[in-house]
Curated annotation (Swiss-Prot):
PROSITE patterns: WD_REPEATS_1, WD_REPEATS_2, WD_REPEATS_REGION. InterPro entries: Coronin, DUF1899, WD40/YVTN_repeat-like_dom_sf, WD40_repeat_CS, WD40_repeat_dom_sf, WD40_rpt. One of its GO terms (biological process) is actin filament organization. The gene is Coro6. The keyword Coiled coil applies. It comes from Rattus norvegicus (Rat). The keyword Repeat applies. The lineage of its organism: Eukaryota, Metazoa, Chordata, Craniata, Vertebrata. Residues 419-429 have a biased composition (Low complexity). GO terms for molecular function: actin filament binding. WD repeats lie at residues 79-119, 129-169, 173-212, 216-259, 264-304. Signal peptide: none annotated. This is Coronin-6. Transmembrane segments: none annotated. Keywords: Coiled coil, Repeat, WD repeat.
Amino acid sequence: MSRRVVRQSKFRHVFGQAAKADQAYEDIRVSKVTWDSAFCAVNPKFLAIIVEAGGGGAFIVLPLAKTGRVDKNYPLVTGHTGPVLDIDWCPHNDNVIASASDDTTVMVWQIPDYTPVRNITEPVITLEGHSKRVGILSWHPTARNVLLSAGGDNVIIIWNVGTGEVLLSLDDIHPDVIHSVCWNSNGSLLATTCKDKTLRIIDPRKSQVVAERFAAHEGMRPMRAVFTRLGHIFTTGFTRMSQRELGLWDPNNFEEPVALQEMDTSNGVLLPFYDPDSSIVYLCGKGDSSIRYFEITDEPPFVHYLNTFSSKEPQRGMGFMPKRGLDVSKCEIARFYKLHERKCEPIVMTVPRKSDLFQDDLYPDTPGPEPALEADEWLSGQDAEPVLISLKEGYVPPKHREFRVTKRNILDVRPPASPRRSQSASEAPLSQQHTLETLLEEMKALRERVQAQEERITALENMLCELVDGTD
């Protein structure tokens, strides 16, 4: 009598659970634009969602704690003249977010810690270089102020948003529309998928294709690709018969896939969200009502199905919280923000554990908010892995950091770097001055809000008087 051997994995019993109704974000008009991006971005401080807006594109930014019904007059981030197609939080500053639009521009915004009283309309910087709509954004994982954008002009531009300069422009690699772009862990390589059905590995600083695979998935529908911790490329796509499919590839040998699995028949593009700490990939399809997740290992069959979280309502987009934003006391290993037609619903993935102690095996050190390189260091050829932090004591977001743009003058000579010194008592007034400026900004915003409310009350009182006079 043979006995079936069950594969041992600490993630075998991961289960998903939707948040209670009072923990959702209600009455949000999620964008109806047809585009295969996530429409949602989240970090440990804020939730951003692309929304419907008249007269151009907009997105809403909410503090994570602001759950419940969102007022219809809640301030938006506006400035684009066309629909917003993608948004992405800076991994090194939780108050900075980039947006890409149908209007061919990329804008970078500074979000205040306090709730603004009116729409945010002035970006810190506008990046203009594409000739057609911009639909893909991705910040460099380790270099400060380095942002990638990809447009309908088949061009990838890598920017230094601190100066507004174009660092690199990859304009002769893709012959057709780019479907996805992903950095590897240290930002030395890119994985891209294209309408020509080719998966490419690119060295951006050399503008060279390191490896490529034609028809990684044979269908005509869009592919997606992400790097894994082991250096493989995980892809989602479609078969020739329009079945959804996932694949795992070794970029050193693209001849045959490491793994290739057919999924189901559906038109929705599968968006992969990969967690390198656990090596779990979560697949979320637009229009689906489920999240399927797989563990990627170096043992056959290499891509191991774990489970499926199912709900009743289809998803219109999905946000994925960075690991440092999770609640380690509850053994969360992932948290999603599912977009419905009129709301956003958190979904938590948990590993059941009996002990209340910190689970070291679930939470290895993870990338923190500090960059490992400056933009010019990366451009010169340096590489560095992310600066890791421990989650043992729980992650506390740093205080608000100002994002500044410096227009570099080519005649300027950069002074030599001064040796680092520890913070002394003489530096304390600078910190106090920054705190005072922040408080003054918040007081000004509160005064403006009170004035606006008083004007609204006066208008309502006048309307009431007119109604009373009309009934006499």
